[in-house]
Amino acid sequence: MIHSIKKQLMAAYQMKDLGAATLYLGIRITRDGKQRSIWIDQEDYIHNALTRFNLLNANDTKTPLPEGVHLVAATEPMSPEKLTRYQQLIGTLLYASIGTRPDIAFAVTRLSRYNTNPTDEHHRYTQYILKYLKGTIKTHIHYDGSSHAGLIGYSDSDWGENKDDRHSTSGQVFTLFNGAISWRSR
């Protein structure tokens, strides 16, 4: 079926068949036909982010955020340079969390709420998450095609934990073949 679709596309458009994808938008794709498995990761993307934000030699952390973190909005504006740096860090972390790292989605979403009024503490926590990624850089999502696991969904919420506006945070993840296919925290 795929070959038929490719043939039709090649007849209609000028295109080349470059074979199986190994890299897509910074996400590395590794296949094993015998095991019927696919792994996706962002190891190179994370390494480049650590280099960009001068954290390549920093000590890693064991969790995305320390236990008991309570974030509040800034009362004083941050300098434009620091604000831009914070927003760049948040954007970098959001891309990783959307691509292959559901383990940081909650932490990044919480910090992104302060994208217009962060504090130095928020900035330290974005670096904390990046240090966590450093320590877990080899983490990947594995889709096990030999598994009989169907679509499974999980969800949770915290009911008004945000101290600024009392909004709840909720999260969900859906898996197929034992690998996450969709996740979100908001």
Placement of each model-derived feature along the sequence:
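Long, low-complexity, charge-biased intrinsically disordered regions
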Residues: M1-R186
